Amino acid sequence: MRVGGLMKKVKKFKYKRVRLYWQDIVSNPEWLTLAKAKDQMYSWCEDTGYLLHKDQKKVIIFASHSFDDDGELSVGNTTTYPRSVVKKIEVLK
């Protein structure tokens, strides 16, 4: 990476680009019959980013990254999901 005319050593980028498929809650402020209320469904969602962390409790991705002047990686636009709502993680090329 070139900074101010000097080449800085950048550490290897080791994070995989992924697409998450996850379920989100849906709320409705309207008055509904019981039958219509029971027919409501949750929402299927997709997000893409770089996989920062995954364990049995949570999944964390980030969408933006930058290497600081000293070569350290900084990340932005992080999203943390409860593991229970993430239904599939697809590694992208």
PLM regions and their residue ranges:
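Conserved RNA-binding domains used in RNP assembly and mRNA/RNA metabolism
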Residues: 2-93
